[in-house]
Amino acid sequence: MNKSPRRYHITTFGCQMNKADSERMAGILEDLGFQWSEDANEADLILYNTCTIRDNAEQKVYSYLGRQAKRKQTQPDLTLIVAGCVAQQEGEQLLRRVPEVDLIIGPQHANRLGDLLQQVFDGSQVVATEPIHIMEDITKPRRDSNITAWVNVIYGCNERCTYCVVPGVRGVEQSRTPAAIRAEMAQLGQQGYQEITLLGQNIDAYGRDLPGVTASGRHLHNFTDLLYYVHDVAGIERLRFATSHPRYFTERLIKACQELPKVCEHFHIPFQSGDNDILKAMKRGYTQEKYRQIIANIRDLMPDAAISADAIVGFPGETEAQFENTLKLVDEIGFDQLNTAAYSPRPGTPAAIWDDQLSEQVKSDRLQRLNHLVATKAAERSQRYLGRIEEILVEDVNPKDASQVMGRTRGNRLTFFTGDIEELRGKFVKVKITEVRPFSLTGVIF
């Protein structure tokens, strides 16, 4: 490849899927001879892997792009790439807004980055957003960690939630084969990785698009069976997965998590709203009663399991009483962590053009009230850790205190304790918890 920039920088916005995509694209760039630059302003190639789930994330991308577009006016050899969901959604329109961009690459094309770059270096301005079958991973990702790793098991989403752009920007569901997933995990185990998170926009949909059904009519491939299939991969000591959908979540999956010792006691199951009418308007496909039953089933079999979720406030037409149903659900379930957001109208989604939009003031007020309750309930949940001995996988140094290291419990609770990172990085350490906060813990080596 001619005229290759020597140094590259990737800025990633949004979800774990985007982070995994960025790692794959970084691996492609390094296979092509590029070297990582910590400072974007010193890089010859800059890639923004973008998120369009909310408007503020999208506007941040344009702010970053504007600065680098000005730089390109004096450094014409700078290569600007926009990847991810904004790239997919905006396409040619993004080029009209920021003509300095060289390559626009949607999520389904991430594995084609090398071929598309060749076209750029040959003098073309390239837009790759057409729906395609995703190429199997053929490049070793440049992982941000050598302890934990993400492994995609399914791309895309077939749901049609009325607020969500994901199906439009990430395409239909495409499952990787069990053999390909296990092979990637085996390679990670050989490289010394300890923990893997299996990823999917709707991980419970895994296998529905793969060929074959059982005699009873069940899909031959499903996520629960996949967990059993990959559980014994050598070297991998912990398994996590995200994200689950209440509509498809099964008791069989809970039982598998209970039986398989490597699977961590943590479930991320977004509920989005605690009101049935809002859930119906969102086209989520379940009721708050069904969601409560899922959590009850988990806690019956795994009483100490950590539960995290996502919630949206201020959905079009949401009344005060309907919002209070969300507060009631959060209060009664008690989440270990809850990712909250005020509703943000996204272009191309049905809810964005409804007449009953709420004011920003109302949405902000409800978000603040929900966040206050979330912190209160998380603090209550943290109390169960006080005095306990927890197994912590040490990942890094505490960025706020160099004398401490940090890692996570099996329940995904961030934990800090005094220790030497050079000695402890990548090791499992028994820690006695001496201090608890809503979303983190402090302890001492036991």
UniProtKB/Swiss-Prot annotation:
Residues of the MTTase N-terminal domain: 6-122
The EC number(s) this enzyme carries: 2.8.4.3
Catalysed reaction, written as an equation: N(6)-dimethylallyladenosine(37) in tRNA + (sulfur carrier)-SH + AH2 + 2 S-adenosyl-L-methionine = 2-methylsulfanyl-N(6)-dimethylallyladenosine(37) in tRNA + (sulfur carrier)-H + 5'-deoxyadenosine + L-methionine + A + S-adenosyl-L-homocysteine + 2 H(+)
GO cellular component: cytoplasm
Pfam families assigned to the protein according to its UniProt record, in alphabetical order: Radical_SAM, TRAM, UPF0004
Cellular compartment(s): Cytoplasm
Listed InterPro entries: Elp3/MiaA/NifB-like_rSAM (IPR006638), Methylthiotransferase (IPR005839), Methylthiotransferase_CS (IPR020612), Methylthiotransferase_N (IPR013848), Methylthiotransferase_N_sf (IPR038135), MiaB_methiolase (IPR006463), rSAM (IPR007197), rSAM_horseshoe (IPR023404)
Domain annotation Radical SAM core: ranges: 143-380
Disulfide bonds: none
Subunit structure: Monomer.
Role of this protein: Catalyzes the methylthiolation of N6-(dimethylallyl)adenosine (i(6)A), leading to the formation of 2-methylthio-N6-(dimethylallyl)adenosine (ms(2)i(6)A) at position 37 in tRNAs that read codons beginning with uridine.
Protein name: tRNA-2-methylthio-N(6)-dimethylallyladenosine synthase
Protein source organism: Microcystis aeruginosa (strain NIES-843 / IAM M-2473)
This protein's encoding gene: miaB
